């Protein structure tokens, strides 16, 4: 069992984009920004315990930070990890419930 403190650090935020919204509607997949050191088991456990839903599968991808320039200085944005969490049939998770009102 993962400690409650670690569960809260694994999931950073829901990732909201056009592609993520289409995935939610078509395949019941929610996209999260997660900790870079989090693994699939931790992500699945965190979603199940925090949102009380059943997870079917988890896919992850590390998004590389873009190189940015400000004047003569070059810098790089931080890398971050994105997790595609597919929920089991009949399960749903709605972040914008009541926001349209």
Swiss-Prot record:
Query: What domain of life does the UniProt record list for this protein's source?
Result: Bacteria
Q: Where are the transmembrane segments?
A: none
Gene3D superfamilies membership: 3.30.70.330
- Pfam families from the UniProt entry: Ribosomal_L23 (PF00276)
Would you tell me the Gene Ontology cellular component terms?
A: ribonucleoprotein complex; ribosome
InterPro entries found in the cross-reference section: Nucleotide-bd_a/b_plait_sf (IPR012677), Ribosomal_uL23-like (IPR013025), Ribosomal_uL23/eL15/eS24_sf (IPR012678), Ribosomal_uL23_CS (IPR001014)
Its GO biological process annotations read: translation
Which terms are listed as keywords in the entry?
A: Ribonucleoprotein, Ribosomal protein, RNA-binding, rRNA-binding
A GO MF label: rRNA binding
Give the record's subunit note: Part of the 50S ribosomal subunit. Contacts protein L29, and trigger factor when it is bound to the ribosome.
Q: Which PANTHER family match?
A: 60S RIBOSOMAL PROTEIN L23A (PTHR11620)
Entry's family note: Belongs to the universal ribosomal protein uL23 family.
What is the role of the protein in this entry? One of the early assembly proteins it binds 23S rRNA. One of the proteins that surrounds the polypeptide exit tunnel on the outside of the ribosome. Forms the main docking site for trigger factor binding to the ribosome.
Protein name, as recorded: Large ribosomal subunit protein uL23
Name the species this protein comes from. Answer: Histophilus somni (strain 129Pt)
């Amino acid at each position: 069992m993962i400690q409650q403190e670690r569960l809260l650090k694994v999931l950073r935020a829901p990732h909201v984009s056009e592609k993520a919204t289409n995935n939610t509607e078509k395949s019941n997949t929610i996209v999260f920004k997660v900790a870079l050191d989090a693994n699939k088991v931790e992500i699945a456990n965190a979603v199940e315990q925090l949102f009380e839903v059943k997870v079917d599968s988890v896919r992850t991808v590390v998004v590389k930070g873009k190189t940015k320039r400000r004047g003569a200085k070059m810098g790089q944005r931080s890398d971050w990890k994105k997790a595609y969490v597919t929920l089991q049939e009949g399960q749903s998770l709605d972040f914008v419930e009541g926001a349209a009102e």
